[in-house]
């Protein structure tokens, strides 16, 4: 009797276990497969935009600025003496103040090759395509203030003078008359205050005047005609103390015209 009770109890236990395993999906004798957890799919990030080339790395001297105009420029007309103005923003500013002159003045073949912010080493690099290759009779060079401001890095005054001399001598070697213009007065730089440029300007101008006389070049002294008691440009001639207004260019124009005439008259 006791044996029958034990068998019945064991049977009930087996049935209960079978029910439990069936309920949780376990089938005896069948290996269970593991199911990995679902990993959410993350969209690939959008490609980064292509970096914008730094022009100071790809074209430091800005040779492309006047390339197309240089190529398209016809040779000087017969009997007309071409003059190229090489410089920085002050030369570029001539565009609205007489260089190039009004189209009606066909007797003046004046070509403006000023680029704002440039220093003398940049100008020296582009001197051949922007000056020599244009076959001018005269080049007017106005440069150096941005060297003193450190626009392209620290420079000594001797380095500035060397670059000015190199441009002048390159021109002379190609039969181009040279007009060297004094650096304009500057008491301070609004974009780099505290550099005290006034005495440095005077030092380069003193060298330039002597160098021009020694080599037979023309020296145009804008500085003496425009400087104020501080050694800078007065507010009547400049809003920022560096770039001349129309009133400033009105003083400069007859001076540079006289310099060009003197250069053309020289043997």
What kind of region is each of these model predictions?
Residues 86, 113, 220-222:
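Hydrophobic residues at beta-strand termini and immediately following loops
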Residues 1-86, 91-97, 134, 261-267:
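N-terminal secretory targeting modules
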Residues 58-63, 115-119, 197:
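Short, flexible loop segments at the rims of nucleotide/cofactor-binding pockets, characterized by
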Residues 82-84, 111-112, 177:
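Soluble periplasmic/extracytoplasmic beta-strand elements of cell-envelope proteins
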Residues 5, 16, 102-109, 118, ...:
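Alpha-helical cap/lid subdomain in secreted, periplasmic
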């Amino acid at each position: 009797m006791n044996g029958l009770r034990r068998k019945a109890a064991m049977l009930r236990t087996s049935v209960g276990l079978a029910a439990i395993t069936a309920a949780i999906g376990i089938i005896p004798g069948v290996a269970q497969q593991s199911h990995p957890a679902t990993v959410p799919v993350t969209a690939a990030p959008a490609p980064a935009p292509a970096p914008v080339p730094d022009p100071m790395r790809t074209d430091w001297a800005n040779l492309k600025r006047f390339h197309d105009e240089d190529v398209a420029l016809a040779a000087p007309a017969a009997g007309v003496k071409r003059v190229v103005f090489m410089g920085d923003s002050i030369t570029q500013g001539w565009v609205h103040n007489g260089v190039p002159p009004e189209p009606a003045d066909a007797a003046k073949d004046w070509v403006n090759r000023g680029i704002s912010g440039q220093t003398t080493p940049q100008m020296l690099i582009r001197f051949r395509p922007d000056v020599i290759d244009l076959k001018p009779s005269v080049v007017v060079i106005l440069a150096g203030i941005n060297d003193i401001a450190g626009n392209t890095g620290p420079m000594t005054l001797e380095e500035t003078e060397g670059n000015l001399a190199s441009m002048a001598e390159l021109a002379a070697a190609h039969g181009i008359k040279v007009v060297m213009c004094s650096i304009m007065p500057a008491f301070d730089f609004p974009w780099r205050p505290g550099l005290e440029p006034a005495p440095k300007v005077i030092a380069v101008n003193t060298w330039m005047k002597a160098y021009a006389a020694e080599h037979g070049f023309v020296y145009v002294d804008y500085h003496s005609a425009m400087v104020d008691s501080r050694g800078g440009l007065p507010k009547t001639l400049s809003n920022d103390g560096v770039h001349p207004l129309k009133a400033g260019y009105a003083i400069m124009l007859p001076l540079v015209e006289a310099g060009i005439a003197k250069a053309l008259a020289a043997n």
